[in-house]
Amino acid sequence: MTDYKDTLNLPQTDFPMRANLPEREPQTLARWQTLDLYRKIRKDREGQPKFILHDGPPYANGRAHLGTAFNKTLKDIVVKSKTLSGFDAPFVPGWDCHGLPIELNVEKKLGKDKLSANAFRQACRDYAFSQIELQRDDFQRLGVLGDWQHPYLTMDFGYEADTVRALAKIVANGHLLRGQKPVHWCAACGSALAEAEVEYRDKASPAVDVGFEAVDAEAVRQRFGVKNATTRVLVPIWTTTPWTLPANEAVSVHPELHYALVKSELQNQPVYLILAKDLVDSAMQRYGVDDYEVHGNLKGDALEGMQLQHPFLDRIVPIILGEHVTTEAGTGNVHTAPAHGLEDYFVAEKYNLPINNPVDARGRFIPDTFLVGGQPVFKANEPIIVLLADSGHLLHSETIQHSYPHCWRHKTPLIFRATPQWFIGMNKNGLRERALAEIEKVTWLPAWGEARIGKMVADRPDWCISRQRLWGIPIPLFIHKKSGELHPKSPALMEKVAQLIEKESVDAWFDLDPKVLLGDDADHYEKVTDVLDVWFDSGVTHFCVLEKRRELKVPADIYLEGSDQHRGWFQSSLLTSLAIRDKAPYKSVLTYGFVVDSQGRKMSKSLGNVILPADVVKNLGADVLRLWAASMDYTVEVNVSDEILKRASDAYRRIRNTARFLLSNLYDFDPKKDKVAVDQLVALDRWAIFTTQKLQEKIITAYDRYRFPAIYQAIHNFCTVEMGSFYLDIIKDRLYTSKESGLPRRSAQTALYYIAEAFVRWIAPIISFTADEIWQFMPGDREPSVFLTQWFSDFPNAALSGEEEQRWQLLLQIRDEVNKALETYRNEGKIGSALTAEVVLYADERLNAVIATLGEELRFVLITSEASVLPFNEKSKAAFDTALPGLALEINVSEFEKCARCWQRRSSVGQIKEHADLCDRCVSNAFEDGEMRQFA
């Protein structure tokens, strides 16, 4: 048998079938760096409309984990897609560098007490730099393009100085206030915590009912209409923090609730109890009392001003009115310790009650506190409960499990503790109302983000921005020692401090002698040594980065972070921006869910489910991780596991194989010389170009709307269905067997060229390494990188009419039914390959009209050796119906010989003496002018 291999146009390409991403990706990275790709993109896009995705700074501590890898990948997809859309879309990465975790790491390594404050801060700075280098390497290895040589760091001297300037503007605009307010306090940190540093965990706590005795029992009884009685009156409170009782200054009742006077016997003594009417039964059940009488009821506002004796201190406390009182649990009477709770603080403020805080920064009672002096607060619960029991004031005690605030770093329970702190006042100058109004102007993705952050802002207390730590940006203020007022020239003084910090770091403030700035006034002022909350540091990036860097702008087009940032960075950025310039720093905000395992559990060493991005990159490649990130629905929790990553790897392989097919059939195609005019294209090729163009419109729209899973699905389906199992399958015969430079082959190559040009750009934002690798093998002159181009727009006008589109859709369905039937016959051993089969299609008028247009070329669409069509009502006994109404099939094994070149079984094989083992079509294609195709 003659070998006709040399007469075929077999695929050729140096583009490797095996991706070998872990080895090949670093080579691409090196090429990007040699090319200075990021700078080239910036130069190429100069003068184009800006699109700014502002990078929320990750914390400079530890290697990148899967959450931060997911974050940076999504951002990179957005930025690259906007670049392909023609925008100038710079990406300036940043890092959050101050705060407790870095302090703790340095303290652990070097010890805090062994170093001066300045040396300790320098050690923190050095540690943060080392962590930034690690994370920078991790992010670059993921293929994230950005200004990695010039990131913003919140510890850069210039950034620290600008943060002080931002604070100065907030001071000048009247948003800063000082107060002794209760804040979340971590005894282990020795500092206040921000809302975003608080996490809730279950905790076992004592729940006690404590009786406060009315000083004038007779007056109380008379208010309830009870006369001629001598029984004492108790007002029971219910609390899970008995340790706060030394700080009690009042008992709160709700003005509109109804309260009952309940007569009973407790501890073998008659007693009257004042309880919220709705809670009488549950309270008496708790006290183990079945026999009791209700004597009248009053609304809470009638109880205001009644005097009560503190249960163990020589202190008279009033009943006051508070809207925060509920009937969800307890007694309807709320123990009020203004130093240990925000609601307590606010209600006490109305009554001008003292803020009595007996707890120090270490979470211990100050030494002269009655009974519990020097004790840690949680250990003080027990002696207080014992004392209450001994004095007859303890009505009930039990242990309950409840959700309780904990330090995000130490995982230890927090306390509310009143300390002198600096706050951004939510109700000063209408900040809260302006924030709520601005939230409505922002586009929130998903849409529920608006309600979430709106509720948080509506409910949040004043923002405590001060911390008592060493490693941070100072709050450079002077307070008058007598009046407590800020220096009248504070903003101007802060600018001078900012200039010093810009040259010498934050040490300049801590080392500063006040006389340098204040002269003789220095003796009258106290220098503030607190530092700023790290959420303030990162919250003013709009001022310190977006506003200051020439290539950026404010407001940013989008902020993109995890949904936990509704109470973190999104909020701190919004509030500082409004306090400075009275508008939001972003036009839109996109959030994603936490990265969890396949069972919805958080990543944890104890569960053994931690997957490190470095391991994924090392084993599968960054592009597989990027494809996983794009494929996930980020609006909910994002699942990851080895199995899920394997599926991403399989999908990647299909995409790569499609690209390889395209490239391997364009090896001899020169777009300048070989492109076929649209009016000469084979109909199937025109359909393929039109389908590609239509899909591109959908893909670009999906990129614009950040619908990455839809893009992933569209590309995956394109590779496996419309292209992989239909178009590319059909044209193989034409590509391989038609005349090398003949119209049928060049028509197919023209379509493949357009498909490849579009396809490589579609995948570029997602699997960037692979796209740029493909780009190097594409035919024709081109830029050195796909990222220096835009979406492909040089499509010919291959538009199809609605009728033509419908016809091809029907042909897709018909071919699918034929394929299923052939597969069944193959599995049953009735045929070998599809080319051993001859197919008769029995079609109704509608389908017949479509199929008949293909004529002799029907067999090429079905990839069978012979195919014919007959009316549906002429079905033979051997025919069987399909799932497509109006279509039946009959499949027979061809009786003809196989062509040695195209492998089709044709009656013409053996008919041409000089080429007895070839069909007439192959003789024409190999040795004569070649066949012509019109449809397929």
From Swiss-Prot:
Its EC number is 6.1.1.5. SUPFAM superfamilies: Anticodon-binding domain of a subclass of class I aminoacyl-tRNA synthetases (SSF47323), Nucleotidylyl transferase (SSF52374), ValRS/IleRS/LeuRS editing domain (SSF50677). L-isoleucyl-5'-AMP binds at E561. GO terms for cellular component: cytosol. A motif ('HIGH' region) lies at residues 58-68. It is an enzyme of class 6 (ligase). Zn(2+) binds at C899, C902, C919, C922. It is found in: Cytoplasm. It catalyses: tRNA(Ile) + L-isoleucine + ATP = L-isoleucyl-tRNA(Ile) + AMP + diphosphate. Coiled coil: none annotated. Keywords: Aminoacyl-tRNA synthetase, ATP-binding, Cytoplasm, Ligase, Metal-binding, Nucleotide-binding, Protein biosynthesis, Zinc. Binds 1 zinc ion per subunit. Its cofactor is Zn(2+). One of its GO terms (molecular function) is tRNA binding. IleRS has two distinct active sites: one for aminoacylation and one for editing. The misactivated valine is translocated from the active site to the editing site, which sterically excludes the correctly activated isoleucine. The single editing site contains two valyl binding pockets, one specific for each substrate (Val-AMP or Val-tRNA(Ile)). Monomer. Belongs to the class-I aminoacyl-tRNA synthetase family. IleS type 1 subfamily. This is Isoleucine--tRNA ligase. The lineage of its organism: Bacteria, Pseudomonadati, Pseudomonadota, Gammaproteobacteria, Legionellales. The gene is ileS.
